[in-house]
Amino acid sequence: MPTYISLVQFTDKGIQAAKETTQRVTDWAAKVKSKGVSIKDMYWTLGHYDQVCVYEAPDDETAASVLLAADMLGNIRTRTMRAFTTSEMERILSQMP
């Protein structure tokens, strides 16, 4: 399954409810599991971003839909990247002209 990495920032609403952040992630992971999304790692961080989430989704459309739904709740803003494993990158490189 494709892997994604989201860099997460709390909104004003999200930081006001920071004590609930771990429970929100637990609840969210259970909710998106039914869409085939699996959260592999979640880190709370210092600096420009408040969290880093590593997860797998069946496809880009599913990843986008769960991110949009999360952002709509108003607690976070996300910047997301598609990540490639070594074997995926080797396949990509083998297709280069």
What label would you give each PLM region?
Residues 15, 53, 79:
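Short, flexible active-site loop motifs that bind/organize anionic cofactors or intermediates
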